[in-house]
Amino acid sequence: MTVKEKKIIDQYVPIVVESTGRYERAYDIFSRLLKDRIVFLGSPIDDYVANLVIAQLLFLEAEDPDKDVYLYINSPGGSVTAGLAIYDTMQYIKCDVSTICVGQAASMAAVLLAAGAKGKRYALPNARIMIHQPLGGAEGPAKDVEIITRELLRIKDLLNRILSKHTGQPIEKIEKDTDRDFFMSAEEAKEYGIVDKVVSTRE
């Protein structure tokens, strides 16, 4: 995300004012949600976005390691390395991370959705989930192309194994399904093992 894009987004972030007795306090909407242990991933995943999500996860663990964190996801995916940084942090912290898909979770975002705590992964009824193999390309000397191709294959295998671990699907099925864009409805994602429940209202 460029500085210019961030400034444009910041212009549209609502400010919430809370009154407590004689005092008023203003928060941007995401800071207010953080008070309720809600982290919102609502953009393509890059290093900037990943660092923000990771910082929030670490902060909430420090606040209370025994309480769940709620990660809402509406993202088309993005950088694999940035996404894996979020994934590793989700597994690293002591808190259970409940994942909730609103809108879409595609590519790396689908991996994060599946990586939530077992029994605490949700999708709203009209959410769309998509898995596929990592995208990449190479040009230049043949040796460089070979090196990049080898790394892409390593990352592809890594992501497939992560999906297999969290969905319970055999690695062979994951490899076949991620060979091309594989779209799922919320119910299909539940059957696949990416989410545990489709929810339409708060319980």
Swiss-Prot record:
Top class in the EC scheme: hydrolase
Keywords, ordered alphabetically: Cytoplasm, Hydrolase, Protease, Serine protease
Record flagged with keyword Endoplasmic reticulum: no
GO terms of molecular function: ATP-dependent peptidase activity; ATPase binding; serine-type endopeptidase activity
GO biological process: protein quality control for misfolded or incompletely synthesized proteins
SUPFAM superfamilies assigned to the protein according to its UniProt record, in alphabetical order: ClpP/crotonase
EC number: 3.4.21.92
Primary location recorded for the protein, binned into one broad class: cytoplasm
Record: active site: 107, 132
Reactions this protein catalyses: Hydrolysis of proteins to small peptides in the presence of ATP and magnesium. alpha-casein is the usual test substrate. In the absence of ATP, only oligopeptides shorter than five residues are hydrolyzed (such as succinyl-Leu-Tyr-|-NHMec, and Leu-Tyr-Leu-|-Tyr-Trp, in which cleavage of the -Tyr-|-Leu- and -Tyr-|-Trp bonds also occurs)
GO CC terms in record: cytoplasm; endopeptidase Clp complex
Assembly, per entry: Fourteen ClpP subunits assemble into 2 heptameric rings which stack back to back to give a disk-like structure with a central cavity, resembling the structure of eukaryotic proteasomes.
Function of the protein: Cleaves peptides in various proteins in a process that requires ATP hydrolysis. Has a chymotrypsin-like activity. Plays a major role in the degradation of misfolded proteins.
Family of this protein: Belongs to the peptidase S14 family.
Protein's name in the database: ATP-dependent Clp protease proteolytic subunit
Organism: Thermotoga maritima (strain ATCC 43589 / DSM 3109 / JCM 10099 / NBRC 100826 / MSB8)
